[in-house]
Amino acid sequence: MTQVKPKEVDEISLQLVVGLGNPGPQYANTRHNCGFMVVDRLAQRWGIPLVLEKRFQGSYGEGFALGGKRRLLKPETYMNRSGQSVRAVLDWYKLDLASVLVVYDDMDLPLGRLRLRGSGSAGGHNGMKSIIQHLGSEAFPRLRLGVGKPKGSQDVVGHVLGGFAPAEQEVLERVLDVAVEAVECCWQEGLRTAMNRFNPLDLSGPSSDLDGSNPAPGHGEASS
């Protein structure tokens, strides 16, 4: 893998938000599709239609919002080949790696937590593995949304391709709303400010504070 020195977070100017997931209605509300959910909310909020683009192997849209041009992408390749779609968009528009923000689910974070970073490894996520492989670098921003680990005897694939329990749905809605705010903060105020503002939040409780006053303590076939 080509080693590219990550840019400082203050240098990053976002051009594209990528949400990861699996295509098809049977996967629409699964844990593994949290990235799709965020991009869908951004598209609705910004009035940007998402259209299937064969050249990008994904649903793509662009328009003006927050005072500038915004691009959104949902790879339709299934999770394990997400990098093909992201690479195609970067090549077509000549975008810098550091201008891409990837949104995806993360089992290492509990439901109710989210985490912004300027770079990093795939952490076992197959969609991120594919993107890192196709981009040849880990030096791009990402927003991880916690979905928690499997409970009891449930396996990993069953967990990430499973839906949210009714008791989890309220927390999920809060997380998705705050994820949209975090993306907009990245665009308007920069990644460093967004990291400081949103990474400490714990949205898991019924009275979770969204202002930071309640911080947390110090997969062709549907693919996982």
From Swiss-Prot:
Recorded GO MF terms: peptidyl-tRNA hydrolase activity; tRNA binding
Low complexity bias: start-end ranges: 203-215
Marked site: Stabilizes the basic form of H active site to accept a proton: D105
Domain of life: Bacteria
Active site: H32 (proton acceptor)
Ranges that cross the membrane: none
GO biological process terms, semicolon-separated: protein quality control for misfolded or incompletely synthesized proteins; rescue of stalled ribosome
EC assignment: 3.1.1.29
Annotated site residues (Discriminates between blocked and unblocked aminoacyl-tRNA) in this chain: N22
Alphabetic keyword roster: Cytoplasm, Hydrolase, RNA-binding, tRNA-binding
Region (Disordered) residue spans: 203-224
GO CC list: cytoplasm
PROSITE patterns attached to this UniProt entry: PEPT_TRNA_HYDROL_1 (PS01195), PEPT_TRNA_HYDROL_2 (PS01196)
Family matches, as NCBIfam families: pth
Protein role: Hydrolyzes ribosome-free peptidyl-tRNAs (with 1 or more amino acids incorporated), which drop off the ribosome during protein synthesis, or as a result of ribosome stalling.
Family as reported in the entry's similarity comment: Belongs to the PTH family.
Assembly behavior: Monomer.
Name recorded for this polypeptide: Peptidyl-tRNA hydrolase
Organism: Synechococcus sp. (strain JA-2-3B'a(2-13)) (Cyanobacteria bacterium Yellowstone B-Prime)
Gene expressing this chain: pth
